[in-house]
From Swiss-Prot:
It is found in: Cytoplasm. Its EC number is 4.3.2.1. InterPro entries: Arg_succ_lyase_C, Argininosuccinate_lyase, Fumarase/histidase_N, Fumarate_lyase_CS, Fumarate_lyase_fam, Fumarate_lyase_N, L-Aspartase-like. The gene is argH. The keyword Nuclease does not apply. It catalyses: 2-(N(omega)-L-arginino)succinate = fumarate + L-arginine. It holds the Pfam family ASL_C2. It comes from the Bacteria. HAMAP family: Arg_succ_lyase. It comes from Leuconostoc mesenteroides subsp. mesenteroides (strain ATCC 8293 / DSM 20343 / BCRC 11652 / CCM 1803 / JCM 6124 / NCDO 523 / NBRC 100496 / NCIMB 8023 / NCTC 12954 / NRRL B-1118 / 37Y). One of its GO terms (cellular component) is cytosol. This is Argininosuccinate lyase. GO terms for molecular function: argininosuccinate lyase activity. Belongs to the lyase 1 family. Argininosuccinate lyase subfamily.
Amino acid sequence: MSDKLWGGRFTAKAAEWVDEFGASIHFDQKMAAEDIEGSIAHAKMLGKQGIISPEESEKIVSGLKIINEELIAGKIEFDVKNEDIHMNIESLLTEKIGPVAGKLHTARSRNDQVATDFHLWVKHRLPHVLESLTELQEELLTLATTHAGTIMSGYTHLQHAQPITYGHYLLAYFEMFQRDYERFEFNQKHTDILPLGAAALAGTTFPIDREFVASELGFDSIYHNSLDAVSDRDFALEFLSNAAILMMHLSRMAEELILWSTYEFNYIELSDDFSTGSSIMPQKKNADFAELVRGKTGRSYGALMGLLTTMKSLPLAYNKDMQEDKEQVFDIMDTVLASVKVFTGMLSGLTVHKERMLATTQDDFSNATELADYLATKGVPFREAHAIVGQLVLTGIQSKTPLQKMSLSDLQAVAPQIEEDIYDKLQSETAVNRRTSLGGTAVENVKKEIVRNKKVLEAR
């Protein structure tokens, strides 16, 4: 006969290596605190509803609290023979209080139990993600305030495009992380639903009180379909999807930190705290931590695709495949929290080379659009103006003369509409500050956006 808690209808024991293959305790032990938390609420409900006696309920709750204390103290050792965290906790409870521990599983299945544990685990940690994002956004605003007027080249196709301010650049990432914050906030809504009470898949005949359990565990709502309750992993997929998008945003900025800290760019320098050296080249200062964040982004994509693939063909309700839903979430939760923390630290110690940033806008022809716009205001059709300025740029490249250093007579030879006032408009600072349209890079705009974004954070 099988020695499993569920082994009544089995006549033989599985080989030890088979038990090892089927066990999940090596990773789902991370949910031990949540399993105990859910079981305490369930035991209280069973006693309240008269499904077990008040004395039995109290004995079970007391035993679970002792196990939790031992867990916190690091005194608990889990056994792979008990398969998963649920069976391990129940086995420990039986050792402490005897056969009455077997009554804890009344009106409950491991199907709704594990779903509850998983919901609780994610629910407990999403606030930490939101807090870490807020800290990152605060650091971005601090840096943007300092550099609201720091002029640099803006890029498209990694080629100089138009001058912008570094503060404007930083606020672009603030907006991205704001969307990330809002996605994780919405993720909380779908995580904050109680599965417990669905039992295996069809509900239970016992007179349970799911509202009581939801209140005890702090859930905002309850699943209204027992099949959905034990089958749903959307909340985990949403977390992984949100995490993948967040990591993509971090990776994009990491790429720029890496590029801009090179000798060729020299726009920024990362602090020694977030750099490493070479074992052979003494001069090296590598942006390893930014590179690691960039590398871990692929890991987050893999986790999302892994769980999507696991879930894609599963018939209702629970299937053992769903045991594979947790490791990715556990890993990516740690990855996200660590990556955001590292990024916040990197930004706080960043040195910005303002003079170098400005210098790259002086001879890169990124003011060409200013000249085309100028001609358009003089009545020249923009397409014609575009062609005229393109010719001037080619001439300037060949003669190594920036537009703002060409003589007025040379400019007028190509476009007689050009007057002396063009030289001010071709200055990087003027070009930046004329971009006053909503969302534009003008310093005045950047400062207004900083104020607006500070209010966004204060409202949290």
